[in-house]
Amino acid sequence: PLTAMRINLEFVNDEELRDGLMRNLDELQVLTEQVLAAAKGAGGEKPRQVDLSALVESLCTDLDEMGEPVNWNNHSPAPISCRPNEIKRAVRNLVENAVAYGHKADVRIIDTADGYDVLVEDEGPGIPEDERQRVFEPFVRLESSRNEATGGTGLGLTLVKAIAEGHGGAV
């Protein structure tokens, strides 16, 4: 149905109206993809051995080629057992948030006693201390002024947390 709606919008003559409706349709598509990703998280993909460093580097390269300001700080191979598509989704959500609120993302992997941490850093305003738990609740968005400027559904960080916890990690 979303593709049919997108095709029909091409016939709307009012350019401003068409562009606004296209943006709404884009948001609906992102919401749909995120809800489906969350539903798949309950089952679906089986864990397998991958190189976390290569996985994250590939994602950063793809985003960089699409014009996203992403800096990847190379890491030696980092073998882990995970559901790679979920990990890619979580890192992508973090990078997209960093770019939306901090205008760029610096991504790196660090070795820890338990394995590896993926760090996504930006120069944005940060999340206020008293909002740091609430931001992981479904459909929660902070500051309405930021909502209009950055778009989004309020599911990105919810998915990040669910994926991290599903892999024995944390955000």
Language model segments and positions:
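A residue-level detector for a conserved hydrophobic packing site
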Residues: I87-K88
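Short conserved segment of the HATPase_c
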Residues: I127-R141
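Short beta-to-alpha transition helix within the HATPase_c
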Residues: R48-E65
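Conserved catalytic submotifs in the C-terminal HATPase_c
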Residues: P69-C82, I110-A113
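Short alpha-helical Gxxx[C/S/T] motif in the catalytic ATP-binding
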Residues: G151, G156, V160
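Conserved glycine-rich
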Residues: G168-G169
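Conserved micro-motifs of the catalytic ATP-binding
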Residues: G41-E45, P79-C82
